[in-house]
Amino acid sequence: MNRILDHIGIGRENAVTREELEMRMGLPDRTIRNMIEAARREGALIVNDGSGAGYYISDNLEDLKRQQKMNNSRAMSILVQQKHLRRRIKELEAKENA
């Protein structure tokens, strides 16, 4: 996977914030976020409970359900924005082609 997993603990009690990860790894926030996303895409069960406690690896049913719910909410928000973007793009393209 990627080396971010060497710095993210297992279980909520071992959660680490992005700021801590930045300090430990000497990397900027955006790089840390990209590494977390890449590890998740590769199958790492990195969760963030939204409380500010940070990131941790979990195999706990409730943790995973909470993360899934947060992910679904984000995905729906993006899809709604995409709908508005598509509509506006069509309007502008029609105006341009008129």
Predicted features by range, described:
Residues 8-14, 42:
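Short helix-capping/hinge SLiMs at alpha-helix to coil transitions
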Residues 51-59:
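Minor-groove-contacting beta-hairpin "wing" of winged helix-turn-helix DNA-binding domains
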Residues 40-50:
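A short, conserved structural fragment
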Residues 61-67:
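Short, charged/polar, Gly/Pro-enriched secondary-structure boundary elements
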Residues 17-24:
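A short acidic, leucine-rich amphipathic alpha-helix
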Residues 27-38:
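Short amphipathic alpha-helical interaction segments
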Residues 67-98:
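Long, low-complexity, charge-rich intrinsically disordered regions
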Residues 1-5:
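Short, leucine-enriched amphipathic alpha-helices that occur as contiguous helical runs
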